[in-house]
């Protein structure tokens, strides 16, 4: 009798994706982040669902409802901090996942890569709207500043901003619609994840060498299921430690002050995971130019496959490209630091230099070094 997991209409889909899936034998721990992102999404949807049962999306009661969750709801504090810090873990895994794709040349699977970029935008939008919901000072002013950027769009900008706000300022209508979209988007993200996996399983996984691994495949279960479970345990240990020992480490103290439209905080800044893009936005003195640079800082990932001119797929055997890649990582850390600093000397010039370097490395230096390495291969 044939095994039920191979014949049942639903089970055979799961079987072909997670059990009998042929996987390259050389996958390193850098390939763990896809499954870790799945766990993060599950944690966020579950904790978010329970938080939504107690949260009220009204400007008069939103801040108090979050306080009520923390003080009066059984384990409400745990749910709230798991959700807030879960977002940070989500972005850590997300950036490492994208970094892995850049380093090992996974972007040559263009459909999977493009769906991944779409997922990145969707998760960023979800996180931004979620940050507005507690209705603290940074929530309110963050929402005001970031949505106001759309007014830089010629001709329709002002109308577009007022349409998003649902009025002439960030108010009750804005909060209600942000809550609705923040609840809806994770399910759209989950659907996009399915499409992401569908395209990935069409081509099979890349591997650290960048060389086709068809002659050397192993079943996903038990080898990579065990490896993934170890990854889950490490990540959940890190998340639990953050939540239980220093839950406010990555947050902003200003968000414990109720939103006040009449009092602007001295330094308006988004959550840490958006600071690199915020630094790029601020480094350009023109509003429209800043907005374009902000969008391009993420959208630039879409042209990376076009800029790949190397004869080798992975950077594993390309030391010059490796140096450039780690310089790019250093630039991103610098931008993240600058995004959290006030707009004054010397931070302005450091931010502008780092922003120029960011685009220069990806658009010009990476392809140039790849061509140099191609030339060196002939020697």
UniProtKB/Swiss-Prot annotation:
GO biological process: mitochondrial electron transport, ubiquinol to cytochrome c
Keyword entries, A-Z: Electron transport, Heme, Iron, Membrane, Metal-binding, Mitochondrion, Mitochondrion inner membrane, Respiratory chain, Transmembrane, Transmembrane helix, Transport, Ubiquinone
Xref: InterPro entries: Cyt_b/b6_C, Cyt_b/b6_C_sf, Cyt_b/b6_N, Cytb/b6-like_sf, Cytochrome_b, Cytochrome_b_C_euk/bac, Cytochrome_b_N_euk/bac, Di-haem_cyt_TM
Subcellular location: Mitochondrion inner membrane
Known cofactor(s): heme b
Single GO term (MF): ubiquinol-cytochrome-c reductase activity
Cellular component, GO, one term: mitochondrial inner membrane
Membrane topology: Multi-pass membrane protein
List of residues binding heme b b562: 83, 182
Cofactor note: Binds 2 heme b groups non-covalently.
Binding site for heme b b566: 97, 196
UniProt-annotated binding residues for a ubiquinone: 201
Segments crossing the lipid bilayer: 33-53, 77-98, 113-133, 178-198, 226-246, 288-308, 320-340, 347-367
Other observations noted: Heme 1 (or BL or b562) is low-potential and absorbs at about 562 nm, and heme 2 (or BH or b566) is high-potential and absorbs at about 566 nm.
Family: Belongs to the cytochrome b family.
Subunit and interaction comment: The cytochrome bc1 complex contains 11 subunits: 3 respiratory subunits (MT-CYB, CYC1 and UQCRFS1), 2 core proteins (UQCRC1 and UQCRC2) and 6 low-molecular weight proteins (UQCRH/QCR6, UQCRB/QCR7, UQCRQ/QCR8, UQCR10/QCR9, UQCR11/QCR10 and a cleavage product of UQCRFS1). This cytochrome bc1 complex then forms a dimer.
Protein task: Component of the ubiquinol-cytochrome c reductase complex (complex III or cytochrome b-c1 complex) that is part of the mitochondrial respiratory chain. The b-c1 complex mediates electron transfer from ubiquinol to cytochrome c. Contributes to the generation of a proton gradient across the mitochondrial membrane that is then used for ATP synthesis.
Protein name: Cytochrome b
Originating species: Uroderma magnirostrum
Organismal lineage: Eukaryota, Metazoa, Chordata, Craniata, Vertebrata
Gene field: MT-CYB
């Amino acid at each position: 009798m044939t095994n039920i997991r191979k014949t049942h209409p639903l089970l055979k889909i799961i079987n072909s994706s997670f059990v009998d899936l042929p996987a390259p034998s050389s996958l390193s721990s850098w390939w763990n982040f896809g499954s870790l992102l799945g766990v993060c999404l599950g944690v966020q949807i579950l904790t978010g669902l329970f938080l939504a049962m107690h949260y009220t999306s009204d400007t008069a009661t939103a801040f108090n409802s979050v306080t009520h969750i923390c003080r009066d709801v059984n384990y409400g504090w745990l749910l709230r901090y798991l959700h807030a810090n879960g977002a940070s873990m989500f972005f850590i895994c997300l950036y490492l996942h994208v970094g892995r794709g850049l380093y090992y040349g996974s972007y040559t699977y263009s459909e999977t890569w493009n769906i991944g970029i779409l997922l990145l935008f969707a998760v960023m939008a979800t996180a931004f709207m979620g940050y507005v919901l507690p209705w603290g000072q940074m929530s309110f002013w963050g929402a005001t500043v970031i949505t106001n950027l759309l007014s830089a769009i010629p001709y329709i900008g002002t109308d577009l901003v007022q349409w998003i706000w649902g009025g002439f300022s960030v108010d009750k209508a804005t909060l209600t619609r942000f809550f609705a979209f923040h609840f809806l988007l994770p399910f759209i993200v989950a659907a996009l994840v399915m499409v992401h996996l569908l395209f990935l399983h069409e081509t099979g996984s890349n591997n650290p060498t960048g060389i086709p691994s068809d002659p050397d495949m192993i079943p996903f279960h038990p080898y990579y299921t065990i490896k993934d479970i170890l990854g889950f345990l490490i990540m959940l240990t890190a998340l639990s430690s953050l939540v239980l020992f220093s839950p406010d480490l990555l947050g902003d103290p200003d968000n414990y002050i109720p939103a006040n439209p009449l009092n602007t905080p001295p330094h308006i800044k988004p959550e840490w995971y958006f600071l690199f893009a915020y630094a790029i936005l601020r480094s350009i003195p023109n509003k429209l130019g800043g907005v374009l640079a902000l969008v391009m800082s993420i959208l630039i990932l879409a042209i990376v496959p076009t800029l790949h001119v190397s004869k080798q797929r992975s950077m594993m055997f390309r030391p010059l490209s490796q140096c450039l890649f780690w310089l790019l990582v250093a630039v991103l850390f610098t931008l993240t630091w600058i995004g959290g600093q006030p707009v004054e000397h010397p931070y302005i010039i450091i931010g502008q230099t780092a922003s120029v370097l960011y685009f220069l490395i990806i658009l010009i230096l990476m392809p140039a070094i790849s061509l140099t390495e191609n030339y060196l291969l002939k020697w």
